[in-house]
Amino acid sequence: MKPTTIASLQKCKQDKKRFATITAYDYSFAKLFAEEGLNVMLVGDSLGMTVQGHDSTLPVTVADIAYHTAAVRRGAPNCLLLADLPFMAYATPEQAFENAATVMRAGANMVKIEGGEWLVETVQMLTERAVPVCGHLGLTPQSVNIFGGYKVQGRGDEAGDRLLSDALALEAAGAQLLVLECVPVELAKRITEALAIPVIGIGAGNVTDGQILVMHDAFGITGGHIPKFAKNFLAETGDIRAAVRQYMAEVESGVYPGEEHSFH
């Protein structure tokens, strides 16, 4: 199978072809996703909640991310694999580079970091040293204590303009992908159209170039609060492989996310 690359996603944006991505944390699910053609995966620090049982992503370490990245890479050798740099792993550009090197050696193709213009120097340093970067704006879970909970971001002209400015700054610094989480559809559309790089949404409506879901949300195996943007594809299909295919098909056709999964 031909490897999926950042250039593959860039072509999807140019061709206006939506694409699906998903979180993965282990060999078996990564292998299954790849076999069904879902070839863009993120080893997210969401594993702190979905795998480790914490109430936030904050306890996750670089070693945790590297461990799960290696497992996913063994299951999906040709996927485009993103890996989060967890909380306090990129406080300085030098620290970011050291920790990015660790997860890249474990098998990641790209690192994802949360934050806006304050990360410009870090993004520049990483890209200059051959570490591709995916930005993450909107609801950034590592900042949950600043936000006062998991809340929609970017509402209102001032907040929206600030997120757009952050997105443009990250792109100019060298970021090659951007995740937008829990922002109004109207803002997601502005940002997606303003950027040349692909934008992946989660809780950002169906106007972004791609979508991502935490796999536990996609299969309805998350306990407690269910995010508005989540959809249980397993409930509709009764089979994990069929659920993966359904998720991909609905993203590619624009059916998912629907209005009921979106914010304004």
UniProtKB/Swiss-Prot annotation:
It is found in: Cytoplasm. It is an enzyme of class 2 (transferase). GO terms for molecular function: 3-methyl-2-oxobutanoate hydroxymethyltransferase activity; magnesium ion binding. It catalyses: 3-methyl-2-oxobutanoate + (6R)-5,10-methylene-5,6,7,8-tetrahydrofolate + H2O = 2-dehydropantoate + (6S)-5,6,7,8-tetrahydrofolate. Binds 1 Mg(2+) ion per subunit. Pathway: Cofactor biosynthesis; (R)-pantothenate biosynthesis; (R)-pantoate from 3-methyl-2-oxobutanoate: step 1/2. Belongs to the PanB family. Keywords: Cytoplasm, Magnesium, Metal-binding, Pantothenate biosynthesis, Transferase. This is 3-methyl-2-oxobutanoate hydroxymethyltransferase.
